[in-house]
A protein has these predicted regions:
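Interhelical loop and helix-boundary elements at the membrane-water interface
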Residues: 2-16, 62-88, 106-113, 128-153, ...
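The first (N-terminal) embedded transmembrane alpha-helix
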Residues: 8-29, 85-95, 152-161
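Central hydrophobic cores of alpha-helical transmembrane segments in multi-pass inner-membrane proteins
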Residues: 21, 25, 44-63, 121-128, ...
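Helix-coil boundary and interhelical linker segments in multi-pass alpha-helical membrane proteins
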Residues: 22-43, 95-114, 160-184, 240-252, ...
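Membrane-embedded alpha-helical segments that form the functional core of polytopic membrane enzymes
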Residues: 35-54, 118-122, 174-198
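Solvent-exposed interhelical
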Residues: 48-89, 189-232
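Transmembrane helix-loop-helix
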Residues: 83-131, 229-276
Length: 295
């Protein structure tokens, strides 16, 4: 049925995978670059689906039903388990294929490329405390104010930096030679950070009870919107304006790229009222899809 399909796509984090691919394709169009190999985009789709679903691995029949998403994972735990297994195997196969195919190009990459790749990988590992919680007793998911910026940074790296590294591997050309990608990276970093802050609003009651010092817990809902989200959106908009001026965007191009910022601003003010979980999964994440399409 329609509702089951919606639940599967959004609760199962498949929409997140679509967003990762769309943002990466948007970057290529914005910078006028060739697209990456299809197999890379398949791997890019699978990786965030696997990663975001990991947070729900411990849900079982005895887990209290906190919301519709928890209920869906509890009712579909076998489907989730085997789909995770299948996607992990496929993902390993894809990246093994890419390494084998481009081995000579990969080993000739500058050290900075490896630093970026492993840096993002370690942030991802530390975010869920896969290693850090056992060794150091912490994870980045509980890092308070920095949490949203970390999420935004990782998303911006996946959307703007990894595709450029992959293009270097595929073509042998350096696509970091201009400053254009920097302004696009900053815009996406701030945009995705705002998106993460708005998602924290969804978890405001539980984060407050767990003493997680997110922006909304620290400053309250209204101050977070007016003094955190709005300034970050303005900073992201300034970065985009610089990018648009350098690229000499037409009025139509500029106007289309403004739409996601205006939508995000409207959504931010709508957060003054409580909404269902679907509002956060469809509307808030959906604005990232709008951003990719408008780009």
């Amino acid at each position: 049925t329609y509702q089951r399909s919606v639940n599967f796509i959004f609760f199962g984090n498949y929409f997140v995978g679509i967003l990762a691919v769309m943002l990466s394709i948007e970057m290529a169009f914005q910078l006028g670059l060739p697209l990456n190999e299809t197999v890379y985009y398949i791997g890019l789709f699978l990786a965030p689906v696997i990663y975001y679903t990991y947070a729900y691995k411990s849900i079982n029949d005895s887990t209290p039903i906190a919301n519709q998403r928890t209920r869906w994972f509890r009712e579909n735990k076998k489907l989730v388990h085997w789909s995770q297994v299948g996607m992990i195997i496929l993902c390993i196969g894809i990246f093994s294929f890419l390494i084998f195919k481009h081995f000579n190009e990969i080993i000739r990459l500058p050290l900075i490329y490896y630093s970026i790749g492993f840096g993002v990988l370690f942030v991802g590992i530390f975010y869920y405390g896969l290693i850090s919680k056992k060794l150091f007793g912490f994870n980045l998911r509980n890092s308070g104010w920095t949490k949203a910026f970390i999420i935004g940074f990782v998303w911006a790296c996946c959307a703007n930096i990894f595709p450029l590294i992959m293009l270097r591997i595929e073509t042998g050309q350096d696509y970091f030679h201009t400053d254009l990608w920097v302004w696009l990276f900053i815009k996406n970093w701030l945009f995705c950070t705002v998106n993460a802050i708005m998602f924290d609003i969804k978890d405001y009651p539980s984060d407050s009870n767990l003493y997680l010092r997110t922006f909304v817990v620290s400053f309250g809902l209204r101050r977070t919107i007016y003094f955190i989200i709005v300034p970050l959106l303005i900073a992201g908009l300034i970065s985009f304006c610089i990018f648009a001026l350098i690229k000499e965007f037409s009025i139509i191009q500029f106007s289309f790229n403004l739409i996601p910022f205006l939508l995000t601003l409207a959504i931010a003010f709508s957060m003054l009222r409580r909404h269902s979980i679907f509002y956060y999964l469809i509307v808030i994440d959906g604005v990232i899809l709008v951003k990719a399409l408008c780009g």
